[in-house]
Structure formats: structure tokens, C-alpha cells
From Swiss-Prot:
Keywords: Disulfide bond, FAD, Flavoprotein, Heme, Iron, Metal-binding, Molybdenum, NADP, Nitrate assimilation, Oxidoreductase
SMART domains, per the entry: Cyt-b5 (SM01117)
Gene: NIAD
Family annotation (Pfam families): Cyt-b5 (PF00173), FAD_binding_6 (PF00970), Mo-co_dimer (PF03404), NAD_binding_1 (PF00175), Oxidored_molyb (PF00174)
Residue span(s) of domain FAD-binding FR-type: 641-752
Essential cofactor(s): FAD; heme; Mo-molybdopterin
Protein name (database record): Nitrate reductase [NADPH]
Similarity annotation: Belongs to the nitrate reductase family.
């Protein structure tokens, strides 16, 4: 197959020596105010309209030393990805979501190196070897007359390749400001979630044309290779945008002249200029032409600006908000930020220059040019024009030139795909008399940044005026930006909010002249106090580690230190739950699993606060193990103190709402290491908020099985008026081949065999067990029952009361019925249904007083095991107490 596109003769640009890159960070000549701005002055030798004899457009920054795989990434699924340590991690260690320091980003100039380019990853980075890249294949399917499968090799050989600069921006850029006002569902981006590169590839229009879209096709859905909790990442754009050459939507394989790096989509990604970065799918595997927008989970539940009155609870309860395509984000809005003065930068007046060059960036979307940037020193009462450097326009002067092995495709374009840099000299004396510096930008659609924030539940597209404050400290001016990214403290917004200022009062939380200070919190957060008043002890890491033992276990939740010693006996999950957390940060597990009641108990065990140094050291010690290497094969998989990675290898449908999930362990001869009657924890992360979802499960596979474990899980889907289960929905949506974290064992009960069990470490002999369960609560009951009945020498008698709604809801029924049939003298099995069909011959109704009195009378050396929905457990507890069962004889899983 060949391409016969008519093109001008290509004249390669010189590749060596590298052309100098114009600095955008240096001082400018003083013009107060410039009118018109210098960038539209045709006589300026730097003017965009000049036609130089030699290329003078920006080329990539000088290459940095090749990054290495960082120690912090080695225990994660991204252990194969080299990274720059300067990047600021926004979601902890993994997944990798980062932005560079704002000053470093600006100082690199118009083009950003791949090492400093911001990264948004929803999960693990696909592992692609260099030798596999040319054979990387993606499909074009759906509403097309000619479905195609194309390799990267074919893109290089059979299609015209082009190069042009594009700025990519995360829709969450500047979200931290929204999170300070009111917590959104998104993590805390600063103002550096934006970067620019020269991308090389094939215009998507060329490949879609060959597939011949059908008449009613309207969208192009894209899907990547990154496996996530809710399926592969995917989204869509309109087909007519793809087919519009002015939009410049590209299938890119190079970035700044180098093959894409792993974090940036190696070996192939979409690049959608002028739109949020979430539309530029990385690790591209599918283009699907459709009549409707994408139904991918990430297209629907991410990258939306819901109406400001929709709070997180309403958004969670009503899926209709997410389904409305009007709220989906595509084109970027005008935005700008100040890079210099930097946060906490100081100017000593006695030795300062006469003027300071205030400077930063601005961008807009949809191909629209930023037409003005304005700066104010008096809270927006007066504005002055800043100079603007449109470095992107310098590429337009070169027709028929080659750059990075492809045609530089800019000479005919009138759209603007890139950011611009603005600057303005301000007299130092004026800064001395001012309290803040504001900047705002306007694009050619006359759309201007607003003064006030538009808060939304995902915190996206935040673009109010960017403001830095000026503190007068004697002879020194100190500058303060609004926030710092991630969990880094600092910024005037946090300071004002802590002082009681209302950040939405139209004056950035400051007192309005003539009015009393408004001391009203924007949002009343119902937060349970988990610390004890008067406890000021600072705990260092060494002291915490002295208490890793089972005898005196200390643990950490949100940087606060707790002594669990006195609760070892009373913990509902058993002493092991506390011992396993000893000396560790248990924040994820504790916050995800425990109720408000449990949180309210915490002040009684609070003994101190981690020092900042200890907190940082502990965060770097996240004990997560990947699958074992062949040189260190562990005989058992589970570790009570370490999260281990298990691979989802298959899903087996048991009923309409129940699946058996098979997880592959490290190696074929490895056992799970879970005692009978105990549980393991499974951890996934919410793809939007990155908060940990952790739940306890009991596998149904034999404890002696090697190489895998099977977990039976009932899926609680969303229903009208009821939100489904976070974890079960996430597990149901992840594809085979996805990793999950596991930790264990946990639980206070263990069956040792032949009537002997251990409760909180104390052995006890029993002659009978009453097992009461409902729904998926059968799993721990099933595990103990099977262990007893498989041992012919075990004389323990078991009575099982199993409650369900419908006959098809009875889980493990075949095995349960077989156990009862083959062991009639040792096992009594009673099924009861609340919505039984007409032909049902078993019991009807809930497990109530009648059944309990008939089958669960008190016995010497008897024990009751209960597992089921909260309502069942609460009811059974009260009824058993009324039947004279002692609390010590009733175990709730």
C-alpha cells in the first residue's frame, strides 16, 4: 500500500549544531505599560512576522542525563519505568501522577523535556520493549466499511508523518485551589499540570479515511492498553473534529524528536491539540467509530464539570449527572499563572534592581490564540498589558521543511495549539506599595478568565485570576502563591482559610473595607476527632519501630501515633489486626474499613504525632511487594504486614450477580498461607479520587491449593436510589491480567482441627458449632464447615442456617448439599428463603427467633459462628443473647 499525497519538496533542517533556544525567563526592557504589546510590533527583530534566513524556532531543551528507575518505584508495577526525581508525586508512590516544580517548568522554555513533562496515569504503565514497538498494532473498527489493523511500522512506511508543537494540559490543572475552598473528588494538582512538546506522527484523519466511516458515524472512540479497575482507559472525540485538518488530531510516536517514553504512551498515543489531556489516549490500541459518545467508564465518570450545586453525595447517588454529555470537557478554557516571582521568593529592597520582570504562562483551547494577558496590582481595579511571546508562530515561517524525519506542518496553520509566555517589568517601588499581583488572560473569542472560582465535584477546569500575595517584612518583599501541589503545605489560600477567612467572598477571603470579618467556613466538614487534647508528644521513627512487636504495638493513622496494646483483647477483628499494623502507617486500611464509631474511639489510644522527618521516612517505606523473583521464591503468599501483588487470571460467572475471581500467586508451588476461619484484605484504588478501597474476603479454594486462590464475590451494582458496592463494582470491572493488592491473614478466629479452635490466640475445644449466614456471608462458614467434614476423625457437629432471598441466590449450594448428604450424622443444613418460589420445599422467611430456638439452643462446649449482612448480624446477636448464649460463645466474622 502506498501514499500518493502531493507535498512540497522537503528540505531537512540542520540537525547539528543545535540552534540556541531563546530564554523566556530573563529580564525584559521596562515598558510601563506597553501599548501595543511588543509582540505585535512589526519592527521588532524578534517579531513573529519576520522571515529569518536560518531557522530560529525553539528546539528541545538540551538532553538531561538519562533517568533511571527510582528506588521508590521498584516495589510497584512500574518497576520498569525510568523517571526524573524532580517530579512532584500527587497520588503517593503509585500510580504515577506528577507535575514538575513550576519554576523548573518555566525555565525550560517553550518546549518541555520528556523528563519534566507532566504525567497522568490511572494505573500501571504497560511494559513495552524497544524491539516490540514497530509491531505494535492498533485497530480501526466499528461503523466503518473497511476495518483495519495497522502497525507502527506501517504508520512510518505507508503514511505521511508530520511534526508540530502541541501543549497538553490536564483538566485538573490548578485543582489544589478548589480543594482548599472545598474538597473535590480529585487529587491536588498545582499550576504545573501543563507541558509542551514537538510531537511527530500521522494525522488521525489519514487512517480514518482509509477505514471509510459510514454515513451515520459521529464519534471516534479511543482505547488504550492500560488495564485499570474499571476496564481499559478510553474516551471519544467527534468524528468531524478528527476529519478537520485544522484540528490537527494526531497519532504520535515521537516527542521532541525521540521515541515516546513509557510514561508518555510508548510506542503510540493520540494527541488532541486544544483539548484536555484526558482525550489524548496513551498506549493506543483501538479506534472505534460510533454513532454515540464513548460508554467507557473513564469517559463518563472522569473529565466532567458538573453543575456547581452538585455535591459529592448527590453525584454519587445520581448517575444521571455523569451521563449528560453536556458536562463533558473537551476544549480548554483560557488560563494563566505566574511563575516569577516564585513561591516564597524574596526581594531585598536595599539591593534590588529598579524593576522586576514578572512573568508566567497562558493558554487557551480549541485552537484559539491568547490575545492579551493583563496584570493588576490593586485587586483588579486597574490592569496593564503584558508582553506576549508567541514562540509557536516561529515554526510557521518554514514551508516544506523536515523536522525529526517528518514534514514540519505549520506554515499553513492559523490555529494556536500552544501556550505562550507573558512578561511585564514592574517598578520595584510599585511592588513595595502593593499587596498582591494578579494575572488574567483573554483569547481571540474574547473569553476571559473569571475573577471567581467555579467549584465543581471533580475540581476540573479551574481558571480564576491567578493571584500571588506580597508580604512586607521590613526591607524584604516575600511572595506567596495560592497553593502548593499535592500535600505540600503552603500558600495564601490555606493560610487565609485557617484564619477563618471565607475564600468565596469575592475578596480572596480578606476583610472587605467597611464590613466585619466574615468568619464563616465555606463548608462544614463533619470530621470525627481522632486525637486526644493535650497530647503534644513528637514521635520519631526509631521510637515507632521499637513498638513493632505483638506485645506493645504502636501504629500510625494520618501521621498520628496510637498505642493498640490495651485493645488487643477487645478488637473485633482480633489482636492480629493490630499486630499486623505495628510500626506501620495503617491510614489506608483504617480509614477504608472502620466505622465512625471506631474512629470516635481513637482518642483513647492516641499517644503522639510523628515528626515531619519520621512521616516522610515512613511514607517511603510503603511495604508493597510485587510478584517474587525466581531467586527468592516465598513458600507462602500472604504477609500480614506487607501488601502483595496478585494477578487476576480468570472470572467465572456463578449467577447473575456473583463471580468466582481466581487470583494467580507468585509461583505455581506457592500456597496462600491463610488459616481456616481467617480472611485476607484486597485493595484497589478509586480511579478518580485515588482513595484506597479495601475489603476483607474469605477465599473458597482449599488452603492447600498451590499457585492460586479463588474468591467468591457477590456484585452489588448500582440500583435506582441506591449506590452499589465500591469494591465489588471495581472488581467486576477490572480485566483479567490486572493486579490487586492482598494482605493477611486477619481475624480473631482460627479452626485448628478436631474440635480445637483459637480465639484471639487462646485455644478452646468445642463439640458443636452453630453456623448462621446470609448471602455471601457463606464463605467463611463454608471454609470452616469443609475443614471439619473433610476430616473423618473430627466429631464436631455442625448446624448451618443459610438465609437467602431467592433459590438462585444460594451460593456454594452443590457443595453444601453434598456435605449434608454425605455427613448426615455430623451436619444439619437448613436453607430458608424470603422470596421462595411456589415449588420450594425448604424453610421460608428470615432467620429469626423460631429457627434459632429450633436449631441453636445453648449447649455446653458449643460455639456460634455468624456472617452476613449487618441487619442479620444485629438481629441474631440480640436473639442469641435472649437465649442465654454468652458473648464469648458467639463469633462474628
Amino acid at each position: 500500500m502506498s501514499v500518493t499525497t502531493q507535498q512540497p519538496a522537503v528540505v531537512p533542517l540542520p540537525s547539528s549544531p543545535r540552534l540556541p533556544i531563546e530564554s523566556h525567563a530573563g529580564p525584559r526592557s521596562t515598558q510601563l505599560p506597553p501599548s501595543p504589546p511588543e509582540t505585535v510590533n512589526g519592527d521588532d527583530p524578534k517579531s513573529i512576522t519576520s522571515t529569518p534566513a536560518e531557522p530560529d524556532f525553539p528546539l528541545p531543551p538540551p538532553a538531561n542525563p538519562k533517568p533511571q528507575v527510582l528506588d521508590i518505584d521498584k516495589p510497584t508495577p512500574d518497576a520498569h519505568v525510568p523517571r526524573d526525581p524532580r517530579l512532584i508525586r500527587l497520588t503517593g508512590v503509585h500510580p504515577f501522577n506528577t507535575e514538575p516544580p513550576l519554576t523548573d517548568l518555566y525555565n525550560e522554555g517553550f518546549l518541555t523535556s520528556p523528563e519534566l513533562f507532566y504525567v497522568r496515569n490511572h494505573g500501571a504503565v504497560p511494559e513495552v520493549q524497544d524491539e516490540e514497538c514497530l509491531d505494535w498494532e492498533f485497530s480501526i473498527e466499528g461503523m466503518v466499511a473497511n476495518p483495519l489493523k495497522i502497525t507502527l511500522r506501517q504508520l512510518l512506511e505507508e503514511y505521511e508523518n508530520v511534526t508540530y508543537p502541541v501543549t497538553l494540559v490536564c483538566a485538573g490543572n490548578r485543582r489544589k485551589e478548589q480543594n482548599v475552598v472545598r474538597k473535590s473528588k480529585g487529587f491536588a494538582w498545582g499550576a504545573a499540570g501543563v507541558s509542551t512538546a514537538l510531537f511527530t506522527g500521522v494525522v488521525m484523519k489519514d487512517v480514518i479515511e482509509r477505514a471509510k466511516p459510514l454515513r451515520k458515524a459521529k464519534y471516534v472512540c479511543m482505547e488504550g492498553a492500560d488495564k485499570l479497575p474499571n476496564g481499559y482507559y478510553g474516551t471519544s472525540v467527534k468524528l468531524n473534529w478528527v476529519m478537520d485538518p485544522n484540528r490537527g488530531i494526531m497519532l504520535a510516536h515521537k516527542m521532541n524528536g525521540e521515541n515516546l517514553s513509557l510514561d508518555h504512551g510508548k510506542p503510540l498515543r493520540a494527541v488532541v491539540p486544544g483539548q484536555i489531556g484526558g482525550r489524548s489516549v496513551k498506549w493506543l490500541k483501538k479506534l472505534i467509530v460510533t454513532a454515540e459518545p464513548s460508554d467507557n467508564w473513564y469517559h463518563i465518570y472522569d473529565n466532567r464539570v458538573l453543575p456547581t450545586m452538585v455535591d459529592p453525595d448527590e453525584a454519587a447517588k445520581n448517575p444521571k449527572w455523569w451521563m449528560d454529555e453536556r458536562y463533558a470537557i473537551y476544549d480548554l478554557s483560557p488560563n494563566s499563572a505566574i511563575a516569577f516571582p516564585a513561591h516564597e521568593e524574596k526581594v531585598v529592597l536595599a539591593s534590588a534592581e529598579n524593576s522586576y520582570n514578572v512573568r508566567g504562562y497562558a493558554y487557551s483551547g480549541g485552537g484559539r490564540r491568547i490575545t492579551r494577558c493583563e496584570v493588576s496590582l490593586n485587586k483588579g481595579k486597574n490592569w496593564r498589558l503584558a508582553n506576549i511571546d508567541y514562540a509557536e508562530d516561529k515554526y510557521r515561517d518554514f514551508e516544506g521543511r523536515e523536522l525529526f524525519g517528518a514534514r514540519l506542518d505549520m506554515d499553513w496553520r492559523e490555529t494556536s495549539f500552544c501556550w505562550c509566555f507573558w512578561n511585564l517589568d514592574i517598578a520595584t517601588a510599585e511592588l513595595r506599595d502593593a499587596n498582591d499581583i494578579l494575572v488574567r488572560a483573554m483569547d481571540e473569542a474574547m473569553c476571559i478568565q473569571p475573577r471567581d472560582m467555579y467549584w465543581s465535584v471533580l475540581g476540573m477546569m479551574n481558571n480564576p485570576w491567578y493571584r500571588i500575595t506580597i508580604h512586607h517584612e521590613g526591607d524584604v518583599l516575600r511572595f506567596e502563591h495560592p497553593t502548593q501541589p499535592a500535600l505540600i503545605p503552603g500558600g495564601w489560600m490555606e493560610r487565609v482559610k485557617k484564619a477563618g477567612g471565607n475564600l468565596t467572598n469575592g475578596q480572596w477571603g480578606e476583610q472587605i473595607e467597611g464590613q466585619e470579618l466574615e468568619n464563616t467556613a465555606v463548608e462544614e466538614v463533619k470530621e470525627i476527632k481522632m486525637t486526644k487534647d493535650g497530647v503534644n508528644r513528637i514521635v520519631e521513627l526509631d521510637e515507632l519501630k521499637w513498638h513493632e512487636s505483638a506485645e506493645y504495638p504502636w501504629f500510625v493513622v494520618n501521621d498520628e501515633v496510637y498505642d493498640g496494646t490495651s485493645f488487643l483483647e477487645g478488637h473485633p477483628g482480633g489482636a492480629q489486626s493490630i499486630i499486623s499494623a505495628a510500626g506501620l502507617d495503617a491510614s489506608d486500611e483504617f480509614m477504608a474499613i472502620h466505622s465512625e464509631t471506631a474512629k470516635a474511639m481513637m482518642p483513647a489510644y492516641h499517644i503522639g504525632t510523628l515528626s515531619p522527618t519520621a512521616s516522610k521516612q515512613l511514607s517511603l517505606e510503603e511495604p508493597t511487594s510485587k510478584q517474587a523473583s525466581s531467586s527468592s521464591l516465598r513458600p507462602t503468599f500472604l504477609d500480614s504486614r506487607t501488601w502483595s501483588k496478585a494477578l487476576l487470571s480468570s472470572k467465572t460467572k456463578v449467577s447473575w450477580d456473583t463471580r468466582i475471581f481466581r487470583f494467580k500467586l507468585d509461583h505455581a508451588s506457592q500456597t496462600l498461607g491463610l488459616p481456616t476461619g481467617q480472611h485476607l484484605m484486597i485493595r484497589l484504588r478509586d480511579p478518580v479520587t485515588r482513595e484506597a478501597i479495601i475489603r476483607s474476603y474469605t477465599p473458597i479454594s482449599q488452603i492447600s491449593e498451590q499457585g492460586f486462590c479463588d474468591v467468591l464475590i457477590k456484585i452489588y451494582a448500582d440500583a435506582p436510589g441506591r449506590e452499589g458496592g465500591k469494591m465489588t463494582k471495581a472488581l467486576d470491572s477490572i480485566p483479567c491480567g490486572h493486579w490487586v493488592d492482598m494482605k493477611g491473614p486477619i481475624g480473631k478466629f482460627e479452626y485448628l482441627g478436631k474440635g480445637v479452635c483459637s480465639i484471639n490466640g487462646n485455644e478452646r475445644r468445642v463439640r458443636s458449632m452453630k453456623m448462621i449466614c446470609g448471602g455471601s456471608g457463606i464463605t467463611p462458614i463454608y471454609q470452616v464447615l469443609r475443614a471439619i467434614l473433610q476430616d473423618s476423625a473430627d466429631s464436631t457437629h455442625c448446624t448451618v442456617l443459610n438465609g437467602n432471598r431467592l433459590e438462585e441466590d444460594i451460593l456454594c449450594r452443590e457443595d453444601l448439599d453434598r456435605f449434608a448428604e454425605e455427613n448426615g450424622e455430623r451436619c444439619t443444613l437448613v436453607h430458608t428463603l424470603t422470596q421462595a418460589a411456589e415449588g420450594w420445599t425448604g424453610r421460608r422467611g428470615r432467620i429469626g427467633e423460631e429457627l434459632l430456638k429450633e436449631f441453636c439452643g445453648t449447649e455446653e462446649d458449643g460455639l456460634v459462628l455468624v456472617c452476613g449482612p449487618e441487619g442479620l448480624e444485629r438481629s441474631v446477636k440480640g436473639l442469641l443473647s435472649g437465649m442465654a448464649w454468652r458473648d464469648d460463645d458467639v463469633i462474628f466474622f
